[in-house]
Amino acid sequence: MKKIALVALVMTVGAPVCAEVETTVGADVVSRYIWRGCDLGEAAIQPSLGVSAAGFDLSLWGSTGIVRFADTKEFDITLSYSLAGASLGVTDYWFSVGPEPEGRYFRYDEKATNHVFEAFAGYDFGFASITWNTNFAGNDYKANGDFAFSSYCELSAPFSAGGADWTATLGVVPFESPLYGTDGFAVTNISLTAAKSLEITDSFSLPISAGVTLNPCSEMAYFVFGISF
């Protein structure tokens, strides 16, 4: 995804540079919001804001429907650390729909919050990457009242072909999860996406993408187009 990058040097008076901070600002417009093989709504705008330094990254991400305003709104905060291909992090997902009927953000009561907290770990081998994600708190309970610890494992491989950057992805849910709608181990995400820059003028191009996603568990298929800014 192409981002607008602003680089700032953090300095003390009369001292040399002590850290380099990079800020990224961007937005995507997608024809449908598909996440890990799950359908989360129709066309949406998805802004992002991130700050990174010394391997640490703090990012904000959101999604708001632009066709059906009633679609669930989302606001995520992720803190992660990366070193030599390995990464660890925590994400706070917030949804406008959930156990908290008024959708209030600052409600963290057990079994009455619209937040979901997830920890993740991954490794990028260069030719492929793998990530494991597990919920550890928030709105993720089974029908019997037990916390589900919903988990998702994803393997992705980037490659170039035909003048485009492609990504092939395989995602699985290892055990029962109310969040992903599975009763046990299930393949929920088989996707292939191509991205390239569409040249508008000699000095301006627009990053676009298109991809197909199959969810064998729900027996659904999706084709999504996106524009990045």
Predicted regions located by residue number:
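Cleavable N-terminal export/targeting peptides
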Residues: 1-22
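Outer-membrane beta-barrel proteins
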Residues: 18-229
